[in-house]
Amino acid sequence: MKALTARQQEVFDLIRDHISQTGMPPTRAEIAQRLGFRSPNAAEEHLKALARKGVIEIVSGASRGIRLLLDEEEGLPLVGRVAAGEPLLAQQHIEGHYQVDPSLFKPNADFLLRVSGMSMKDIGIMDGDLLAVHKTQDVRNGQVVVARIDDEVTVKRLKKQGNKVELLPENSEFKPIVVDLREQSFTIEGLAVGVIRNGEWL
């Protein structure tokens, strides 16, 4: 998404707020009146600019034909601390949604996970970083995965052999986690596909 000018942001915020309050987008005349434009045509020019930048879609032939493409409730969910025994993407674990394009990652990211600890620092995954995760159980040895052991969620490099799984850290100060699949509950929650440093820009 290209950055919006201050005026374009005003128009976008007005559309979003109007939809939130009334259930429908404003007309060009209402935008012009609210923001002090001389005519609805001026509002139309700003709408076209917003459409070019990919944040709205203009539906032709309708006075209220504006559709938001950048909805704050959409985007990648950010998962924080996970309570024992509950699904990773349970609503209570989601701290918010962030406008990160899933296709920036290969394969596409499905959610972000806030990293806790420094066990993977040697490959650049730091405490507090946001890890982009592709939700899948189809993973191979050597890949960095998000795994759940009993009720604990961890990020490690996978090494599986028979009934034994080793979850390898990327920090010599940490020891591998060894899982006996005959005795412990073990689930792959997803594959790490990228990292966003500390989330400071979010």
Curated annotation (Swiss-Prot):
Disulfide bonds: none annotated. The keyword DNA-binding applies. Coiled coil: none annotated. The record marks 84-85 as: Cleavage. Keywords: Autocatalytic cleavage, DNA damage, DNA repair, DNA replication, DNA-binding, Hydrolase, Repressor, SOS response, Transcription, Transcription regulation. It catalyses: Hydrolysis of Ala-|-Gly bond in repressor LexA. GO terms for molecular function: DNA binding; serine-type endopeptidase activity. Residues 28-48 bind DNA. Gene3D superfamilies: Umud Fragment, subunit A, Winged helix-like DNA-binding domain superfamily/Winged helix DNA-binding domain. Its EC number is 3.4.21.88. The active site is at residues 119, 156. GO terms for biological process: DNA repair; DNA replication; negative regulation of DNA-templated transcription; proteolysis; SOS response. Homodimer. Belongs to the peptidase S24 family. Represses a number of genes involved in the response to DNA damage (SOS response), including recA and lexA. Binds to the 16 bp palindromic sequence 5'-CTGTATATATATACAG-3'. In the presence of single-stranded DNA, RecA interacts with LexA causing an autocatalytic cleavage which disrupts the DNA-binding part of LexA, leading to derepression of the SOS regulon and eventually DNA repair. PANTHER family: LEXA REPRESSOR (PTHR33516), LEXA REPRESSOR-RELATED (PTHR33516:SF2). This is LexA repressor. It comes from Citrobacter koseri (strain ATCC BAA-895 / CDC 4225-83 / SGSC4696).
